[in-house]
Amino acid sequence: MTSLAVLLTLADSRLPTGAHVHSGGIEEAIAAGLVTGLATLEAFLKRRVRTHGLLTASIAAAVHRGELAVDDADRETDARTPAPAARHASRSQGRGLIRLARRVWPDSGWEELGPRPHLAVVAGRVGALSGLAPEHNALHLVYITMTGSAIAAQRLLALDPAEVTVVTFQLSELCEQIAQEATAGLADLSDPLLDTLAQRHDERVRPLFVS
């Protein structure tokens, strides 16, 4: 498989990692009246890409290049993810990705990562094994950060899929910029709003999405 094919496969929403059950905070944002249509969805996606997307991609890029050991990467992710619910969601998605990765690369020492690693840590190892360039691995993570929330909003608000796709096309340049920034070094930021949404969603009775 070429690196481009790997990139497309990892960015495919049909990848069987369980990511489709996570909304990235958009369900709670809609419930709170913060996202009501396309304009507010675009604003939310920009905010999420610039914070969570950048953070996840930067840690993955460091693991990918071998600059950050997996134990250190796990601790760095915890330190940059204040909300327990957000940490749980990250580890849940990491578990889904590592389950798939074990099937694709069965002899690659996955035990080192433990049973529930953060998504960024697994993604960094996967990127290195698959032959992706670090910037392309970062881009795929930024991209799925955006599209995961966009697709969830489309379902929850019954938005026109074509209109939502237009929004994601308009944010493609931002995704490229954030991916480049992620490869420059570890991001050191969090977003209190996204952390609050994650915690409130975790307390919700029978939500449609896990996070």
Swiss-Prot record:
Its main location: cytoplasm. It comes from the Bacteria. Pfam families: UreF. One of its GO terms (molecular function) is nickel cation binding. Keywords: Chaperone, Cytoplasm, Nickel insertion. One of its GO terms (cellular component) is cytoplasm. It is found in: Cytoplasm. Residues 71-93 are annotated as: Disordered. Belongs to the UreF family. UreD, UreF and UreG form a complex that acts as a GTP-hydrolysis-dependent molecular chaperone, activating the urease apoprotein by helping to assemble the nickel containing metallocenter of UreC. The UreE protein probably delivers the nickel. Required for maturation of urease via the functional incorporation of the urease nickel metallocenter. This is Urease accessory protein UreF. It comes from Mycobacterium bovis (strain ATCC BAA-935 / AF2122/97).
